[in-house]
């Protein structure tokens, strides 16, 4: 059965909201990497020696070693581009891990070696490249040949990538933060109805624990994973980030305290090694059936199915409980260096990520929601994608990662660190005071 993605299930208004809360110009079917900025994935494609125009692209995964299906799809984009433009253009990836990505990208920017194209998350993580003029204005390029018209929602698809009316990045896919669960463990624990509120969630955890299972796998070693959970809890308690930015609400308010205490209440159901486990380890705990649930973005579908294909049949998905239908949504995006000397090559490469081949792969293999109007075969897509689409179709609204939605990247990092610190034993009020102090010194008095 063929489905036109999002145009049936999601309205244009919803797709615009998703990206705020978070045909092609290339083939529809079809540079010198700095020494200290990351690894050059020369094995992805043979480096050009035929005089082709060289560009670089920086990404947060090892394209040669990865089992992540979305990353494997990006590797295919690189290979297709280099093959199709052989003798004219050639792209060399610069790769690192996610935890070190922005540190290494910023080092390249500071040394005036910004990659021609680089992946970025919208929000403050993109602001820091827009404000100093590192990222190029892509507005005219998107409108010039109908590229923008291929996106669901047209210009609305670029809401979170737009600053002062100009577009600085191109979204590649959409994902939602959900609760993944082991259907067999839930059945054996006597859970037949998925929890929709906090009390139901705690009750499910109790039943799983009583049945001998670790209820939740999560990473506090990778701070944003714990922070994502905290963001859901804060939003459920009515924390208003606009009011906090304006100084009319505070990080020490009772609703934030309640959210932090709920995080601690839930933490008794985490795996014993959560404090040191990385995101990859926590995810592996789930797909290796060492825990019953994983609170993670739907980008994890590619990692779960790529690492353990047999687990797909027993992997269910439900919306995080108690949020009144609100869902965390996120999109990976591509930016182009404002100083690139290879603009046409860079744009041609970027268009390959949103052509029909790449976007079909996004849904049919990677399990993420495409951003274009591409038709995809729902029967080929991972089973979990349909569950995520159900979460989106029932969403009342969406919002972004807290660490990407605060006043600055530094504010986001402060929030992340405070949540980890509270989990590790810092008293709630003391931990929240560190965020409050940051805002006093860096946001409200500026």
Walk through the language-model features, giving the residues of each.
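Extracytoplasmic/periplasmic substrate-recognition and gating elements
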Residues: 53, 83-87, 189, 261, ...
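Glycine-centered hinge/linker elements that transmit conformational signals in sensory
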Residues: 205-208, 246-275
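Extracytoplasmic/periplasmic substrate-binding proteins
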Residues: 58-60, 67, 76-77, 228, ...
